């Protein structure tokens, strides 16, 4: 028995150590849940939580086995070095390093989730590849979440203490039996490893992907809880992001249902007004009092008195949405009319596609175009995107520093960019230097991590509510001063202003933490001299390009996935976004959730907390849903197929 135990000891120790990792992944998932509990709390029962935890085991198994292949091979491959202490110290070191890193990634992503509402994928490396401040960001978050660091240290220490080393005594080993036993162990384990990585033994089982998490969830946001970050990272390495579905074999039928190619709406001569697009970092609809008249039983005032004043003079919409959850999603949506499906296309090989946008369209009509962002050149890939879509000039931190009219790098926030207040004044001044007509866009930065404001404003805008609110107040003040300065310029009355956010951010209201609420962004159109109006329509970021083209009476065909919302009947306005493998399509007073093959849920927009899935309501399906459901599916499928075909065929202009 002693000899038999020695021979099988490497296998027993390997299995034991791998089982420890399930505990590590389980604890990391519970921490992920607790850190972001408000996003998962709705409808979370004990039985549903158990269902998601059970589903999580499938993805944990895959991640554990993929990341530990080197360790498994080293432990089970027949090497006579394995009876030596240094060899097992090496194996233990590899085990702790690999799995310590996996744990750290999971814990870090628990903090990052609230910004994206999903698990991190490999596109994060492209997204932040040009940032030189990642060390400072990491240090700031480490200090802010020091308790996660303590948990990390304790868990790695626990792995170290509980780690089991094979008990081998070379004096009692029969080497040929030992070699045979280890080879057989490796051969026996191999199919289980392959099956665990794939997600099952059956030959019909395709290797599991991120989208498989949706079979365990009731809401798209919950997929992040079922998944783990190491799995999400390795499953998106080198993968084809855009796959063309076969919903429509007849292209003409698809074109009749939906086309992103727009024809001129009328023959009115083009009005060459200036166009100014303000993309305000993380400036979600939730923070704006004027867009939340019924929130908190009508008592809510928000944090944006200056934007509230602007709204009183502008065109807004009863429902408005962003088309992604990251800054790099917002840029193509707002400036080129291209939403984010699956991954930000500008972080994929499709970034080499030829893309049009507001800038290129208007440059062709004699406009001078410029993009402004107060960070260093190259930050977030904005400069590359701006150039590819037709912006003739780019002004960043370096250009601000070189302008003697302003404070130079003394106005740098120490982390990301020039503070919003001075940079927006610079923006206004530079537009006064430009020849009309011009088209410009600015991307602000201060309402962003690490959520700090200039020292001189800390007593004016103290901490309140969530950490984001003081930053929103500061940026709102900066916007108010910008419009005051702009109103004194000769170009002001000949300008169309559009204000939106790149995406949403932290929330402290349940409505804005739902699958759809997390995409609620403002779309504000201000044209001096035009009567203000709240239109009972659905608007989205990708509508900005065609709406501006309609306001200008642009005379040529152009490309955008959105619509001219001002010249579209309310019943025909819609919005679309993508979250954790689910497409959300908003139209006709409902939101439909579609996983690419079938509809998972339908909610009435009046069901603000998305608590009543109408797919389970037989009466609704027989009555209202009998016509509505197939119509919405048909339209959404046409949008998806048009998107995927054009991405893969380079037909985005």
Predicted segments with their positions:
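Conformational gate/switch positions in structured elements
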Residues: 110, 136-139, 282, 503, ...
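Residues that form generic nucleotide/phosphate-binding pockets
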Residues: 56, 60, 107, 137-138, ...
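Soluble catalytic regions of membrane-associated enzymes that act on cell-envelope
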Residues: 201-560, 567-573, 577-579
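Transmembrane and membrane-interface helices of multi-pass
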Residues: 2-227
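Membrane-interface soluble catalytic domains
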Residues: 529-653
């Amino acid at each position: 028995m002693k000899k038999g135990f020695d021979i099988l000891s490497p296998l027993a120790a390997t299995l034991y150590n791998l089982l420890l990792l399930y505990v590590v992944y389980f604890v990391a998932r519970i921490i992920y849940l607790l850190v972001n509990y408000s996003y998962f709390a709705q409808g979370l029962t004990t039985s549903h939580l158990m269902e998601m935890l059970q589903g999580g085991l499938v993805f944990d198994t895959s991640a554990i086995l993929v990341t530990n292949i080197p360790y498994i091979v080293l432990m089970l491959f027949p090497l006579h070095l394995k009876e030596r202490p240094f060899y097992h110290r090496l194996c233990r070191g590899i085990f702790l390093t690999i799995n310590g890193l996996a744990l750290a990634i999971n814990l870090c992503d628990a903090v990052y989730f609230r910004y994206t509402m999903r698990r991190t994928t490999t596109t994060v490396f492209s997204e932040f590849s040009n940032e030189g401040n990642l060390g400072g960001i990491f240090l700031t978050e480490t200090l802010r979440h020091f308790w996660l660091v303590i948990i990390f240290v304790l868990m790695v220490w626990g792995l170290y203490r509980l780690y089991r080393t094979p008990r081998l005594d070379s004096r009692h080993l029969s080497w040929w039996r030992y070699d045979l036993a280890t080879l057989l162990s490796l051969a026996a384990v191999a199919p289980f490893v392959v099956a665990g990585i794939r997600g099952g033994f059956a030959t019909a089982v395709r290797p599991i992907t991120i989208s498989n998490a949706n079979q365990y969830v009731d809401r798209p946001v919950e997929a992040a809880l079922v998944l783990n970050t190491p799995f999400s990272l390795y499953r998106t390495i080198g993968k084809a992001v855009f796959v063309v579905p076969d919903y429509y074999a007849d292209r003409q039928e698809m074109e009749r249902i939906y086309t992103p190619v727009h024809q001129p709406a009328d023959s009115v001569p083009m009005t060459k007004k200036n166009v100014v697009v303000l993309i305000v970092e993380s400036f979600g609809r939730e923070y704006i009092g004027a867009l939340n008249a019924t929130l908190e039983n009508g008592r809510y005032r928000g944090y944006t008195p200056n934007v509230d004043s602007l709204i009183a003079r502008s065109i807004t919409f009863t429902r408005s949405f962003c088309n992604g959850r990251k800054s790099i999603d917002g840029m193509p949506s707002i400036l080129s009319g291209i939403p984010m499906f699956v991954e930000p296309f500008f972080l994929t090989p499709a970034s080499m596609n030829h893309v049009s946008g507001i800038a290129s369209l208007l440059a062709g009509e004699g406009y001078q175009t410029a993009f402004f962002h107060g960070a260093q050149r190259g930050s977030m890939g904005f400069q590359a995107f701006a150039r590819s879509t037709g912006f003739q000039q780019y002004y960043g931190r370096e250009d601000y520093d070189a302008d003697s009219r302003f404070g130079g790098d003394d106005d740098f926030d120490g982390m990301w960019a020039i503070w919003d207040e001075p940079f927006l004044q610079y923006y206004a001044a530079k537009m006064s230097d430009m020849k009309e007509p011009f088209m410009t866009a600015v991307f602000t930065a201060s309402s962003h991590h690490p959520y700090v404001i200039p020292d001189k404003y800390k007593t004016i805008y103290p901490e309140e509510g969530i950490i984001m609110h003081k930053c929103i107040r500061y940026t709102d003040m900066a916007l108010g001063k910008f419009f005051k300065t702009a109103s004194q310029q000769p170009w002001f009355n000949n300008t169309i202003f559009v204000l939106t956010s790149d995406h949403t951010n932290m929330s402290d209201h349940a409505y804005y933490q739902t699958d759809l609420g997390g995409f609620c962004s403002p779309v504000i159109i201000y044209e001096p001299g035009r009567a203000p109006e709240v239109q009972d329509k659905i608007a989205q970021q990708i509508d900005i390009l065609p709406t501006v083209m309609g306001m200008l009476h642009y005379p040529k065909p152009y490309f955008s996935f959105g619509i001219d919302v001002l010249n579209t009947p309310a019943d025909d306005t819609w919005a679309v976004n993508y979250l954790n493998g689910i497409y959300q399509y908003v139209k006709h007073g409902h939101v439909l959730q579609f996983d690419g093959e079938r509809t998972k849920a339908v909610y009435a927009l009046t069901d603000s907390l998305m608590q009543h899935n109408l797919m389970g309501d037989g009466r609704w399906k027989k009555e209202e849903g009998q016509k509505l459901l197939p119509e919405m599916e048909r339209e959404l499928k046409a949008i998806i197929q048009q998107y995927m075909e054009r991405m893969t065929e380079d037909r985005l202009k």
